[in-house]
Structure formats: structure tokens, C-alpha cells
């Protein structure tokens, strides 16, 4: 076989390989950054069937809109703790009015049976709840119920490209973390500095809040449920396990993702944001998580410089720790908050 024939064969094989690699990599990039998201109705039906929406419809909720760093509008809702009205018991500030035009005067008394009491000299407690990839804020209601029982006021919102927000590409935590910083600032502007503020996120919501810690936001605690430490490792695992495709395609997909969506997968490393972090973190993760293995939480716990706890839940797949072990989850959450807040 002459050298010309060999060269032609090699060129043909290379062309065939590229004909496979490039389209598949593009499909992967599009799948990651433009995912099919769950509708409110489907999420509502799912959460209701699981029993997580009991009493939710009767709660008084204020719809809010918070402009992010790039002008993108984030939609969400505020649910104050039982017995609290914005016209009393919350430190006033110049930025009290909501960015959605609200005058901040709406009273919202809950009805969840919370028996927590707040003395006149105690700080009001707030938590920002961030849902996971492809879902919407209704996925946070199960955690909202826990915090309301402990006397917290809750802010839950839709990630960009999800829920009630305008459609746009997802950046797996990069822009989403900056969105969360805008929500944190909004809470402080409306309710003042003399409050306790925490973050509780699930999956990509967890990754977003971990990335936000790099900017040292004004928060007092973080609860990370099934978050990832490195996006690349998650995608490699999924490509191999779910689609039985070679892991190297993640690298080529990342190149195309950078071209089309302006970020590479290698940039999304929440673990790096913890190298100087001092905010206490509670890591929650299912031992049987097939999407983001629990070792991601263990790696982040080893990396953070602040106080940390890791709680692993038996027989729990991705984002199912609370659903599988509600009592244990609630007890661990309460103990963590008592330890770091008193």
C-alpha cells in the first residue's frame, strides 16, 4: 500500500472521527447550557404529590423582581415568618422599597403552626433558597417549610433561564452566583444589616451559592445540598454512565460551549471558591447520588477554611436526602444552625 493511499485512509478516518466528535460535542454543549426546564404546573403536581406543598397555597406571599448585575430580571417571592409584618420588627433601611416597585408595607402572617418566638432584641432570621438545575422555586418549598418552623423568613427565587424568568442560556453557576449576590444585596437593602441571613441551595443552586462565597457576601451560614465541586467531573461521569460515550467529548464540548455560550466547563469549579472561605457550611448529600457523587461534598468540606459538617444519607439518590430522611435531615439542620448561630 503506497504512502498516498495510507494518507487518504488517515484523512478519511480523521474526517469520520470529526464528523462524529463535533456534532456530538455540540449536542452536549447545547444540552448543558440550554436544558429543557420543568414547568410550574409539572413542578407543582410533583411537589404536591410528595406532600411538600401542604399549606403553601394559603401562605401570604409577596411576588418580587430583583434586577441582577447585567439587568436580567430574577423573579421570586418573600414569605415572612409567622407573626412578622414588614411594618414592624424589621430594621428599616434607605433601600427598604423592593426593586419591583413594592412599598414594603404588605403584612404577611403565616399559618404554618410555628411556635418560635422572637424577642424585641433578637435579630430577625432570613434564608435565601436556591433550587436546582432545570427545576424552579417550587423545589425549595420543602426546605422553606423547615425554616419557617424555626422562625425564619424565606426568599425563594427562580434561577436565570428557569421558572418565571426569561429564557436564556444557563451557565451552571457562573452568572447564577452573581445573580445570588444581587439577591443577597436586595435582602440587606430591604431588611437592613442587623439580621441573620443564610443560604440553602440544592444541586446547581448549591454550586451557585458556593461560587458566590468567593466574593465574601454578607451571609452567616450556608447549607449545601448535593452540590458539585467541579463541573467537568460531573459531565464526564454522566457521559460515561448515562450515554456510554467517551469522556474526552466533554473537553471538545467545553470548547464549543466557550464559543457559543462564552464559558468553559473548566471555569465552573465551586471548590476553588472555598479556599479562603470562613462562612460555616453544612453539606448534605445522598450516598447513592448517581448524578453528583457525595465525594464532591467531601472534597469541598476538606477545602473550606471555615466550620463545616458533612451529613450523608443512606439510600438517597440525587436531591432526595430530605425526601428519604426528613426527620434526620431536619434534626441535622437544626443542630447545625444552633451550633453556628446560638
Language model regions located:
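An N-terminal hydrophobic leader/cap segment in hydrolases
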Residues: 8-67, 77
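The serine-hydrolase catalytic nucleophile loop
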Residues: 126, 132-146
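Conserved alpha/beta-hydrolase
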Residues: 144-166
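Alpha/beta-hydrolase active-site loop
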Residues: 170-191
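Alpha/beta-hydrolase fold nucleophile elbow
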Residues: 191-203
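Hydrolase active-site cap/lid region
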Residues: 211-263
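Short beta-strand/loop motif that positions the catalytic acidic residue
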Residues: 276-278, 283-285, 289
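Catalytic histidine-centered segment of alpha/beta-hydrolase-like enzymes
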Residues: 316-330
